[in-house]
């Protein structure tokens, strides 16, 4: 057994070999959107491989509070949509939990609804910047009240008649882009969003699949008001952000081979593969296909020696969520790895630049903060020690990977944070472990 429960936290012991075939849970971004768009659509939407993490369950809970009927059996969800013009004013506060996606996308939809709603979340959500969404929504005509002039949750939004805008986003953020486009569906005229570089495009792909005439070219996407959505069948691919932990583990483990099946291969999300390939990873893409507008494939990973690289610019939005585990890989690569243009990491569930660097240092790695990223000097081994997730699901799982690779293993506090996006993470680790 490689992972032992302790009275406080868990003990992760080093592992020398892995073997097997696994499927990671459904993609978090796509699960959120499938549920939300299903609730906005006319007719039934049937979702398979829905992610059962806490974040996506928060989206379903908010939809129910708004009057949307749905049924779930394990990872299969049926949503009986009646169009979001039939949503009603919630009798209670909408609690998004830890989900920034739920908060920001829901604000976009509610901006065009003729009633008032209040949204809040946990302490992490209440400290994350919302002005990047609330300001353009206010420009479109929504009334939003919140802490520090609507910059932080709790937020109360009074929706109504909206006017389309041409919005140039200061950040490459799929959540910002999606919120404005969703508001644009209920706005007069055309709404256009241009990003500094392209963020993940699940919203654009799925809105088209639900029947919306959405046009996109380069870094710009636009919709016209009045578009109606129709219920669809949505087969959610495995989440490449969840697969990333196993890609790094399979690359750096001394022996073994791992096949990860049905992984989403959206080109706006495959930065982790590009980075690992540049570092020298042995990862093969098999059985490439497309289903429900999203490419997917199987990934076969074998051990390899990695070397340091520089990661910056347009590559960053494609791997922003994978930086914690990529930093673990960099700590065991030959030479130096530098990650820049990633200041967005400072306003995630934690300040991920700070927490990743401090965590790596505590495990014996040579890492330092940059204003917009990290600098990591790789070594032949990682000592191990004590680590804490700080309530951040990506950190929790990155430190498990580090513990499995470290000489002394690690003691980890806060593994329960992984429930947000990967409820069966430790089960899959046990499944592929070979003593």
Curated annotation (Swiss-Prot):
Catalytic class of the enzyme: transferase
Residue positions of the active site: 321 (proton acceptor)
Residues bound to phosphoenolpyruvate: 28, 100, 128, 175, 352, 394
EC number(s) per entry: 2.5.1.19
Keyword annotations of the record: Amino-acid biosynthesis, Aromatic amino acid biosynthesis, Cytoplasm, Transferase
Sections of the chain in a coiled coil: none
InterPro entries per record: Enolpyruvate_Tfrase_dom, Enolpyruvate_Tfrase_sf, EPSP_synthase, EPSP_synthase_CS, RNA3'P_cycl/enolpyr_Trfase_a/b
Family annotation (Pfam families): EPSP_synthase
Binding site for 3-phosphoshikimate: 28-29, 33, 173, 175, 321, 348
Superkingdom, natural source: Bacteria
GO biological process, one term: amino acid biosynthetic process
CDD domains xref list: EPSP_synthase (cd01556)
Transit peptide in keyword set: no
Catalytic activity: 3-phosphoshikimate + phosphoenolpyruvate = 5-O-(1-carboxyvinyl)-3-phosphoshikimate + phosphate
Example GO molecular function: 3-phosphoshikimate 1-carboxyvinyltransferase activity
Function: Catalyzes the transfer of the enolpyruvyl moiety of phosphoenolpyruvate (PEP) to the 5-hydroxyl of shikimate-3-phosphate (S3P) to produce enolpyruvyl shikimate-3-phosphate and inorganic phosphate.
Database matches in NCBIfam families: aroA
Membership in a protein family: Belongs to the EPSP synthase family.
HAMAP family cross-referenced by the UniProt entry: EPSP_synth
Name of the protein in its database record: 3-phosphoshikimate 1-carboxyvinyltransferase
Organism: Desulfitobacterium hafniense (strain Y51)
